[in-house]
Amino acid sequence: MFRRLIIFISAIMVESVTVGADTYVCPQLLSDSVAQTVATGDTIIQKESLWKRVSDKLGARYFNSKYDSAYVMRPEGKGLTLKVRMNQTGNTFHAKGTVNGIYSKTDLSTSHKTTFSLAASYRGIGAAIAINPAKWSGVYKDYELNLNYYGRRFSLDLSYQRSESLSGDIYGDRGDKRLESGEATLKVLNLVGYYTFNHRRFSYPAAFTQSYIQRRSAGSWLLGISYQGGSIKTNDELKQRSPDAPEITIEFGHIGLGGGYGYNLVLGSKWLLHASILPTVVVYNRNKMIVNGENKEAQRMRFNMIFNERLAVVYNFSQRFFAGATLVMNNSVFDDKNVVINQNKWRARAFIGVRF
């Protein structure tokens, strides 16, 4: 599939892939309403609120978590965390190679997205409301959704990106060309799930949701699965500028399996430094390419990998107040004897918060 893509690049187009960060999903944070009472004659029927049932289940899981208290502690309070965050995301794409005797080199990127958000986390589940000034002003028209769950044993990252801002330079034997924003539409879904083996002493939530506090340094091996899929399609703007450019649709999907390692380094009693990497080897490919309405056979790459990296710095002023920054990166490498393709998606975040 990507060999066909390079052919297309040399004509005037190319694609980018993946991913990155920000919102959590949870039940709406309502007050702890106890029960609704309904009178029917002499009968009193008590209807327990849905939120209380959910809250009780979350509380049982949160307060009864089996962390080693010498390494990980639960802050005092009800398990509610509020944060103010600034987020920025970006996506770059690089490709070079020779296909059918035609050499090309491509450097593309989507527009950076900067948002400000207010986030709430309740006993491990959270939600965030983000504001994007550039989108309000009409400068940024891309769409991006990020869902994250960080648990004691299992964690999950999901991101979806729809971008029309892909732009950059294409160099090759046929001359240098420019892909302008709006000439192609990229849609990409990324999903990463991973299991933490040393889940009693190593805490992802301590680094990324701050719902726990790492007291002593600890690391853990990780087992993970990743999925990357989506499509790239040329737009009418490209045809208007280059009437001879082909109409191309590329659909792709990759599933990878792998393992990695994460480490939480505690400095003093207030600083936490986190680093982790989870490489996965692609074990399944589903690629499809349509050129001017005709299906083309997609070729497999000989070496496919998807890397997932995370960094975090957290400073706990006390059990209640904290601040920090995180960086999440997703990198893809696709390689055969003629073509090398590399994609990098990243999300940076700075935050300050309080625990209740």
What spans do the regions from the language model cover?
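Cleavable N-terminal export/targeting peptides
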Residues: M1-M73
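Outer-membrane pore/translocation modules
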Residues: Y71, E76, N146-E251
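Transmembrane beta-barrel strands of outer-membrane/channel proteins
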Residues: L82-G90, A120, I129-P133, Y149, ...
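Surface-exposed strand-loop-strand hairpins of Gram-negative outer-membrane beta-barrel proteins
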Residues: G90-T115, G126-S137
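Extracellular/periplasm-exposed beta-strand and loop segments of Gram-negative cell-envelope proteins
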Residues: K105-S117, S167-Y171, K177-L189, G230-H254, ...
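Residue-level signature of outer-membrane beta-barrel architecture
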Residues: A120-Y122, I131, Y149-G151, Y195-F197, ...
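Repeated loop/turn-to-beta-strand initiation elements of outer-membrane beta-barrel proteins
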Residues: G124-A130, R153-D157, H199-F202, W271, ...
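Outer-membrane beta-barrel "beta-signal"
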Residues: N190-G193, N344-F356
